[in-house]
């Protein structure tokens, strides 16, 4: 009888603890963002509140005092929150590195403001890429598969 009662009490207390901790608390200070492309620097040590990243391991929200980490970026939206404003950039991939001094460095081959894309153009490019995936030429099929992955992520971001 005691074991059954103790097991019920333990299970309830464990569930309560897990339910309380679901997201990070805002940290003191600001995150310093460096966002660089080969031809342009979008942010250079700019203090921001939070950055949301499309990482290979899943969506990640980075705040000041985040644990140091290196993440591979997948095609998706990088959202930069500065106070009450938000800027969204579509990246085709890249890397993000969080340093112990609350500096986030994002490097990507290309990044464009999300509002610069036309949903109609994305749909037509997506249809073309889907046709090319079944190409007999292996190189063309591989390139089309990569293009398809990027365009599907872009189409999802525009919805």
UniProtKB/Swiss-Prot annotation:
Keywords: ATP synthesis, CF(1), Hydrogen ion transport, Ion transport, Membrane, Mitochondrion, Mitochondrion inner membrane, Transit peptide, Transport. GO terms for cellular component: mitochondrial inner membrane; proton-transporting ATP synthase complex. InterPro entries: ATP_synth_F1_dsu/esu, ATP_synth_F1_dsu/esu_N, ATPD_C_fung, ATPsynth_dsu/esu_N. It is found in: Mitochondrion; Mitochondrion inner membrane. One of its GO terms (molecular function) is proton-transporting ATP synthase activity, rotational mechanism. Residues 1-23 form a transit peptide. Its main location: mitochondrion. Gene3D superfamilies: 6.10.140.880, F0F1 ATP synthase delta/epsilon subunit, N-terminal. It holds the Pfam family ATPD_C_fung. F-type ATPases have 2 components, CF(1) - the catalytic core - and CF(0) - the membrane proton channel. CF(1) has five subunits: alpha(3), beta(3), gamma(1), delta(1), epsilon(1). CF(0) has three main subunits: a, b and c. Belongs to the ATPase epsilon chain family. Mitochondrial membrane ATP synthase (F(1)F(0) ATP synthase or Complex V) produces ATP from ADP in the presence of a proton gradient across the membrane which is generated by electron transport complexes of the respiratory chain. F-type ATPases consist of two structural domains, F(1) - containing the extramembraneous catalytic core, and F(0) - containing the membrane proton channel, linked together by a central stalk and a peripheral stalk. During catalysis, ATP turnover in the catalytic domain of F(1) is coupled via a rotary mechanism of the central stalk subunits to proton translocation. This is ATP synthase subunit delta, mitochondrial. The gene is ATP16.
